[in-house]
Curated annotation (Swiss-Prot):
It comes from Xanthomonas campestris pv. campestris (strain ATCC 33913 / DSM 3586 / NCPPB 528 / LMG 568 / P 25). Keywords: Cytoplasm, Endonuclease, Hydrolase, Magnesium, Metal-binding, mRNA processing, Nuclease, RNA-binding, rRNA processing, rRNA-binding, tRNA processing. Homodimer. This is Ribonuclease 3. GO terms for molecular function: double-stranded RNA binding; metal ion binding; ribonuclease III activity; rRNA binding. CDD domains: DSRM_RNAse_III_family, RIBOc. Digests double-stranded RNA. Involved in the processing of primary rRNA transcript to yield the immediate precursors to the large and small rRNAs (23S and 16S). Processes some mRNAs, and tRNAs when they are encoded in the rRNA operon. Processes pre-crRNA and tracrRNA of type II CRISPR loci if present in the organism. HAMAP family: RNase_III.
Length: 226
């Protein structure tokens, strides 16, 4: 399965000045060299730095333990694989015949590695500031949905308390779809408010995470209208 050059408007959000970096980031070792393992190594460090910085800035009251747990949740293999699917990386990966036949383009580990490799490719292509600007939006739904320690309430709790304070009906959460293999489930959920009328959708590797993401989006809608 060969990669396609990303164009403007594609989910990744970056047009590469050096297409060779993109090609390498999407080439699994089963397809020969140069493959993406060195880029994956570099990207792992960059992702950890970006997420650590984002959490440090966004949750000033959270202690070290809460920040560490939050970062671990955001950069774990399953979470990165969800991003890989959102970016449609599976259909762009270059895999050897064996990996292709065994469904490697759907495997969490391969997708997560490709995400890290692409982060490194963006960094090498255009530097850290641009890399941050491109990559952080990939994590934004999960950042917004993640409860960080006792200092921060999760989006579902915040939304419920906002509605209760105004004596308004509580939100309803509806499962839109559930897809993927047992080891790579993807849940698609809607959060629906009766009053004020609002609706948002969220996706995640568990129904809880999908509901948190949907609630976070509804909160953002309410904030923009006040």
């Amino acid at each position: 399965m060969s990669n396609r050059t990303f164009q403007r408007g594609d989910p990744i959000g970056h047009a590469f000045a050096d297409p060779g970096l993109l090609a390498q980031a999407l080439r699994h070792r089963s397809a020969g060299t140069p493959h993406n393992e060195r880029l994956e190594f570099l990207g792992d460090g960059i992702v950890n730095l970006l997420i650590a910085e984002a959490l440090y800035q966004r949750w000033p009251k959270a202690d070290e333990g809460a920040l560490t747990r939050a970062r671990a949740e955001l950069v774990r293999e399953g979470a990165l694989a969800v991003i890989g699917r959102t970016l449609n990386l599976g259909e762009r990966l270059t895999l050897g015949p064996g990996e292709l036949k065994s469904g490697g383009h759907r495997r969490d580990s391969i997708l997560a590695d490709a995400v890290e490799a692409i982060v490194a490719a963006i960094y090498l292509d255009c530097g850290f500031e641009r890399c941050r600007a491109v990559v952080l939006p990939w994590f934004e739904p999960s950042l917004a949905a993640l409860p960080v320690g006792k200092a921060e309430k999760d989006p579902k709790t915040r939304l419920q308390e906002w509605l209760q304070a105004r004596q308004l009906p509580l939100p309803q959460y509806a499962l839109i779809s559930e897809s993927g293999d047992e080891h790579a489930k993807q849940f698609h959920v809607a959060c629906i408010l009766e009053q004020p009328a609002a609706r948002a959708e969220g996706q995640g590797t568990s129904r809880r995470l999908a509901e948190q993401q949907a609630a976070a989006t509804v909160i953002a809608q309410l904030d923009s209208n006040t």
